[in-house]
């Protein structure tokens, strides 16, 4: 085995019996991966340097007890501006497809939030984060309880137009997923910074927020790729054979 390093850090693993064809294709892939990382940083820089966004309504949400195990009442009303814990922190909200015309929780949203719950304590070191759903508080909390979402702030949009205003709900109550970022200025006014949707263009189907989940990236490492796999709320038990 040969270890190639850059400044003492492992760059790539090469086994001694690799064919010339494999070596050539692997090097082509390595260079493409480097360019992808550089391009991703260029995109992130464009996002970071967006000019100030428009002011938004200080929407009201319904929130239950912090501890899911204590039940679903009492509930309280909390405003969008109150979700910020410090003046210099951004607020990130994931729009869960559940409620109104969406009578069952979206399996893909659920998979993403499963992962977000696991890293919520890391996210909280930098930004404020919450899940917003059109579902009633009790229904949202029941789903969260079943999934073990014990690290996330769970909010029901209730009668608010929040999801409609941000493009994750239509006039008939059909739901879509999205992730939104907000900032609050020195006067306490909340401004929209950025919202990403899964469907970015006709040829990019439900891949607009792939970076939120490691699932796709793990699958993309394999020769089988992601294929047409789609997440489910439950899976059959796999045998060990």
Predicted regions and their residues:
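Thiol-based oxidoreductase modules, predominantly thioredoxin-like and allied folds used
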Residues: 120-139, 150-161
